[in-house]
Amino acid sequence: NYQYSPPPPPKKKYY
């Protein structure tokens, strides 16, 4: 069975 993987959390860009 194909398991749906939730999208990764948004990455915050630190400058």
Swiss-Prot record:
Keyword list, A-Z: Cell wall, Hydroxylation, Secreted
Keyword Secreted: yes
Compartments where found: Secreted, Cell wall
GO cellular component terms, A-Z: extracellular region
Main localization category: secreted
Location of 4-hydroxyproline modifications: P6, P7, P8, P9, P10
Entry keyword DNA-binding: no
Name the record gives this protein: 200 kDa cell wall protein
Organism this protein belongs to: Nicotiana tabacum (Common tobacco)
